[in-house]
Amino acid sequence: MLAGKPFRIAIAAVCAVMAIPATATAAVAGTSSFGLLRTIAVTNLRSGGWGSLRAAINTVNAGPPGLSWTIQFRVSGIITLTTSLPPVRRPTKIDAMSATGYSGRPLVELNCNGKAGLRFAAGSAGSQLLGLAVDNARGNGVTLDASKITLNGNYIGLDLLGRRAGNSGDGVYVSSTSSRNLIGLNPAAAVGVVSNVISGNGEDGLVLYGSSGNTVVSNRIGTNRGGSARIGNGGAGILITRWSDNNEIGGTAFVDKSTGQANNPTGDKGTVTPVFVVPPLGNLVSGNRSDGIVIAGHSTGNVLNGNFVGTTADGNSALGNGGNGVWIFDASNNSLIGCKFVNNPFVYYNVVSGNRGNGLTVQDSNNVVVQGNFFGSAANNSSVVPNRLNGILVEGTSANTQVGGVIPLGNVSAGNGANGIEVTDEAHGFITFNTFGGLHAFGGAAPNGNDGVLITSTGGDNLVRTNVMSGNTHNGIELAGDATGVTVDPNISGLTTKGNAILPNGGDGLLIDGNAHGNTIGGTLRSVIPQNTFSGNKRYGVEITGWAHNNLVYRSYIGTEILGRTALGNSLGGVLISGGAYLNAIGNFTHRPSNLISGNTGRGVTLLSGTRLNRVVNNYIGRNRFGLPLPNTGIPVLNLGHLNLILANRT
């Protein structure tokens, strides 16, 4: 055996050739160890016999444990099985990219013809499946029972022409004995790379069942290769369940080809226009019959980075999943993270738009983090791709859902059929922070069909902080049902992001109705928004109605621009208290003035008959923040209710 000199062993009964280059590597105990590369060539498209893929796998499996193999293809075309292939039981690189003429799309198809799909069994850890179309299997197209397996460049559920040829089960199934796999590959973090296309299968596209530490990047799941047409899987696009932990769907890397710089922010916060970048490691998960991505079954620590869910590949048109875009159910400590650059206006996002259910549903799940995402907005930040229901729904007993963060970790939830955000049932510890609800990020109106945010939850300890809720069909913010324990401070509702021009909601800036009680509007939280500003709306700045009671409104501007100097009035008046509302307070004696209610078309404050025991105290009504006249067009206060207290207001 000569160092550096390959030699060949012909094995006529099994395959065309096995090439074994032997290279001296190191002397150990007076001998030499050699790195051995075992390559088998597939030379025909038959289901079995000499030169077939079946014969190659049988040879691999007959080898001693610990050896690695490569199966190359000297042919292209369709292998139609007559019986199921044996599982792969040794580390094997099945390299259909080696087929002559390969240029980025599969040239070899494994038509399972109703037989079992391809399975990587125990003993095959470290295997690779490259550039193969796997279709028409009974059950799953590809099953991973071993770890550290790479899938790249494959069609799973499509034929060589990219047409539906679905496997009857899941496209790719990763079992609890398999972990740390690469489903998709894009090491250069290059824009436009399509790794695997997993579409047209009878059940889910990709299932992680008790599997952890996997990375899923640059795949098309539920669409054609171009990401322009639906070839949906029969279930979800991706299902992560049964204690599947710490999987990353997508990624945050980005390389600017013009500079070669990775993750290149555009400058310091506030000095450069935000840049919106299509995330190259993200997956397109669209067109599936059920939900786009499901995280369930106590799975934890999973992260979605930079995926487009429910849109075409460019993120600007709908190619919706039949259910929710993302559904997190009974699975805590998971996250959708679009952006990690806190100090730069580099905006990097998941786009979860165009779906037939909600964009995101968080149900009975705790500590979910949602930062830097678009729900209902297109990737271009200038048009809408509506989710049919809410942008975000938080329900059940979900605790501590964090939607947003410091700039630029906020979200856009705009253009959706119902609400931008809805929080219901007993959800508690919820926060929306730096959300654009009803408008594009730093831009114009993109109305949600109902409210910017609707909270009916009885769970308490929910916070609406530093949001712009403007441009919605109905209200900017609504607290309804038995909502309690909600703090709203500080926000803009009815104006643009800078708070200096009108961007009206079709209803009220803030509506408190139903039996909502014990909520606080205003406070001492400060950020780029100095206080609540409810101005420019087509009805009232603040309306309290129904049987709402024990709600406090203070430290808010109602009818002015954000600095409280000039008028940007609400169309019907500043504050309306109606129905049977009781024991509510517009103002208190902690701050002077408590509220600024000025510049509105209509009366400053109206209390209709049927209301009782409400207080309007210590406010500027018809004056700006400096105490100078800024009148409402009607009288300062009209009180038609019973035992309402009007006291110490400056008019």
Predicted segments — roles?
Residues 1-11:
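Bacterial N-terminal signal peptides that target proteins for export
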Residues 11-21:
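Bacterial N-terminal signal peptides
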Residues 26-147, 152, 158-169, 173, ...:
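N-terminal, post-signal-peptide segments of secreted/periplasmic proteins
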Residues 58, 80-93, 107-128, 135-148, ...:
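Extracellular beta-strand-rich solenoid/capping regions of secreted or surface-exposed proteins
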Residues 82-109, 150-157, 161, 181-192, ...:
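Beta-solenoid repeat scaffold
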Residues 89-90, 123-124, 129, 146-147, ...:
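Parallel beta-helix/beta-solenoid
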Residues 170, 203-204, 236, 290-291, ...:
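Consensus positions within tandem repeat domains that build extended binding/scaffold surfaces
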